[in-house]
Amino acid sequence: MNRKMKITENKEKLYIDELVDKLYCVEVSGKASEKCRTYEKAIQLLLNVFLRHKERESQLFFLGNGGSCAIASHMTADFMKNGGMNTYSLYDNAVTTCMGNDYGYEYIFSRPMEFLVKEGDLVVAISSSGNSRNIINGIATAGKKNAEIITFTGFSPDNKARQMGDVNLYVPCGKYGIVESIHNLILQQIVDMIMEKDGVKF
């Protein structure tokens, strides 16, 4: 019993160690191929983008499937309630099923975005693989609307979404749990930093 418990504890420790290690290996780059060399600079770059759009009162949209959808929905709430930003959900059941039924699942984001996204808005696309067709279509629509795009991806370094954003955050790991946890953690850190700038005391 004690031996099994010890093995479990070691595995948990190793998993946490891997998560922290990958967190500090996160790569943030822009279209001009410039890269942030430290975690702190990467976070500051992302924070500056969100703060700029908050000041402009831009609309903010999050895209994601599965676990990334859960993160997107969570951040839609947090960036509005705690960050004071104009977030809009793309996850209304009636709209999602309508778009999926009438146009196909690959268009569940891009079709409503054609009506909702305006020039100068901010779109955050979250995808562990960076290759989900509906996410790629959503990013493409955001680009046509001249919205600013941030991508959060993982797995392969040459995934499609990573090539399409104005700012691209990449987690060099093939595990869904690690990639999704880091995406969520970084976005939550951005919310907390916005709150601190607004004078909120923790």
PLM segments and residue spans:
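Conserved N-terminal alpha-helical segment that immediately precedes and caps sugar-phosphate-binding
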Residues: 1-202
